[in-house]
Amino acid sequence: MAKRDFYEVLGLSKTADEKEIKRAYKRLAMKYHPDRNQGDKDSESKFKEIKEAYEVLSDPQKRAAYDQYGHAAFEQGGFGGQGGGGFGGADFSDIFGDVFGDIFGGGRRQQRAARGSDLQYNMDLTLEEAVRGITKEIRIPTLETCDKCHGSGAKEGTSAETCSTCHGAGQVHLRQGFFTVQQPCPTCHGRGKVIKEPCSKCHGDGRVERYKTLSVKIPAGVDTGDRIRLSGEGEAGEQGAPAGDLYVQVHVRQHHIFERDGNNLYCEVPINFAVAALGGEIEVPTLDGRVKLKIPAETQTGKMFRMKGKGVKSVRSHGVGDLMCRVVVETPVKLNEKQKQLMEQLGESFGGKGGEKNTPRSKSFLDGVKKFFDDLTK
């Protein structure tokens, strides 16, 4: 048979104070006491029910547990009940943590109002912005401290009061078999204080939703994957607790000329046939402007030239990377008649006596092909 609600047994509401509980118990105990109702089994049963209800509701800790868990708080040995050493439906992690805390003199401290959440903002940068550094304004949605209650969560002119259940401790003690354990107070949720008259603007939270604008200084040399932390610029904490942090996640967009690898920059520089063969001087782009690059004679496609200190300044040290220029020899197109004649003359000169000296890689390749086919026919 299911047990009746203890408040119902004593004819009380759940907001009844200690005096009302004691008064109700005395009145009902006198009415159903076995000495006044000898032989009446029904009165005896009711008296036991009244006594059990009073033992729980007159004890602040037991009452708090009953308000949170109901009769389950006292089943299987909870609060020293006879029989096994069960935990009455309470959370195992809380129980074991608090048992060992009590044994070794620790125990849980009063929970503080929750710190504000951290926020993340994804910021896209051009390569130039990332290399040189920049200050950017961002606008983010967040929770800020309520300006009406100044973060307290309480109505103007009032303040949070000490919790009457745990008397400000934030914890209630429960007896589990041979052990006394602690659990967060069900009334104040471990904070030790309750807000009876909440602020009309934030409804007791101490925070309100709004957008805020921030200036973020991006240091020179950042790269994709870098993260910048702005301490205290996250969401405001509950009821005056510390704010979280804001993390700006950097992403550098792809550049149409340069590729970045660490602190070095890479680019491809096309050169014409004549410059590659005879050598010369060309202009190449850098992030600081145009610079001259000397191309030696007989330069082949793929040749890499290093320009010291023309890369990216390291964000973590004083070092500066290099600019690596890979030349690509470009085949001439849209030749006029005179140019075609000159190219034909040049080609004939390559095919004549001693022409293999002008194109050693071609000769080496053709010799290799000839040997390959000769080996196949053997």
UniProtKB/Swiss-Prot annotation:
Which part of the chain is the J domain? 5-70
The molecular function GO annotations come to:
ATP binding; heat shock protein binding; unfolded protein binding; zinc ion binding
**Keyword check for Zinc-finger:** yes
Q: Which cofactors, if any, are listed as required? A: Zn(2+)
Map the CXXCXGXG motif repeats onto residue numbers. 146-153, 163-170, 185-192, 199-206
Q: What is known of its domains?
A: The J domain is necessary and sufficient to stimulate DnaK ATPase activity. Zinc center 1 plays an important role in the autonomous, DnaK-independent chaperone activity of DnaJ. Zinc center 2 is essential for interaction with DnaK and for DnaJ activity.
Main localization category: cytoplasm
Which subcellular locations apply to this protein? Cytoplasm
Q: Which CDD domains match?
A: DnaJ, DnaJ_C, DnaJ_zf
Alphabetical GO biological process terms: chaperone cofactor-dependent protein refolding; DNA replication; protein refolding; response to heat
> Self-association or partners: how does it assemble?
Homodimer.
What InterPro entries does the record tag this protein with? DnaJ, DnaJ_C, DnaJ_domain, DnaJ_domain_CS, HSP40/DnaJ_pept-bd, HSP_DnaJ_Cys-rich_dom, HSP_DnaJ_Cys-rich_dom_sf, J_dom_sf
**SMART domains according to UniProt:** DnaJ
Binding annotation for Zn(2+) 2: 163, 166, 185, 188
Annotated residues for binding of Zn(2+) 1 = 146, 149, 199, 202
Q: What does this protein do?
A: Participates actively in the response to hyperosmotic and heat shock by preventing the aggregation of stress-denatured proteins and by disaggregating proteins, also in an autonomous, DnaK-independent fashion. Unfolded proteins bind initially to DnaJ; upon interaction with the DnaJ-bound protein, DnaK hydrolyzes its bound ATP, resulting in the formation of a stable complex. GrpE releases ADP from DnaK; ATP binding to DnaK triggers the release of the substrate protein, thus completing the reaction cycle.
Binding note for cofactor: Binds 2 Zn(2+) ions per monomer.
GO cellular-component terms in the record?
cytoplasm
Q: Which Gene3D superfamilies match?
A: DnaJ domain (1.10.287.110), Heat shock protein DnaJ, cysteine-rich domain (2.10.230.10), Urease metallochaperone UreE, N-terminal domain (2.60.260.20)
Q: Where are the zinc fingers (CR-type)?
A: 133-211
Swiss-Prot/TrEMBL keywords: Chaperone, Cytoplasm, DNA replication, Metal-binding, Repeat, Stress response, Zinc, Zinc-finger
Q: Which Pfam families match?
A: DnaJ, DnaJ_C, DnaJ_CXXCXGXG
Q: HAMAP family of this UniProt entry?
A: DnaJ (MF_01152)
Coiled-coil stretches, from where to where? none
Family under the similarity heading: Belongs to the DnaJ family.
Q: What protein name does the entry list?
A: Chaperone protein DnaJ
